[in-house]
Amino acid sequence: MEQRSHSEEVVEEALGGTKAKIVEAALATLKARGFARTSAREIANTGGFNQALIFYHFGSVQNALLAGLDFVSERRLRAYQPAFEEAETLPELAALAREIYREDLENGYVIVLGEMVAGGVSDRELGRQVVARLEPWVEMVEHKVRALVAGSLFEPMVPPRDMAFAIIALYLGIDMVSHLDGDRARAESLLDLGVRVAPLAEALLPSQSPDVR
């Protein structure tokens, strides 16, 4: 009997049964074939089921892919949010960002998001759906930025919402370029630079802020 992967077990636990199998196949096809070539037939071939099941359970290939993106995003939030909330300094946050980036690459999350963004460029409704799924990340970063700059010289100059959006956009851009280029060395070098520079920026912030916790 073929041994199932950990990711398959996690998806099935989250969604259950046939839906889980479809989502897992949709994600695998998206990673292997790209958005443009991820059709109902390709997903069904990957998962070994009738393509009619995709439309029965999700209504469209696009909805199945969005369900996969939902699963990936929610899983990442559950995995990273506790560490993000516990980080109290810029060096800790910079190190965490580097760790998240490496895990995203290893698990193929960069490819999933990158391909969905690519699809959203030519489909405005899909684009809106993808952007909406970034909102929890923007809110999480916004809360942290607000806490970090509280009481500092930066507080009146740094709108937390705008800064959070810029940080997410920068991270997404790094992910996308790494995916397109196939070379993660430059992205990792940039993240390593962030780790080295973070202590310098930290010196400009209040030494203690109870709101950071």
Language model features with spans:
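Short, basic, alpha-helical segments at the C-terminal edge of helix-turn-helix-like DNA-binding modules
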Residues: 70-75
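Hydrophobic alpha-helical connector segments
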Residues: 67, 78-110, 160-167
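Helix-turn-helix
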Residues: 21, 25-63, 67
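Amphipathic alpha-helical segments used for helix-helix packing
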Residues: 92, 105-128
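N-terminal intrinsically disordered/low-complexity leader segments
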Residues: 1-17, 180, 205-213
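Hydrophobic/aromatic-rich alpha-helical bundle segments in the mid-to-C-terminal region
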Residues: 125-131, 135, 149-213
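Solvent-exposed, amphipathic alpha-helical segments
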Residues: 21, 25-32, 79-83, 112, ...
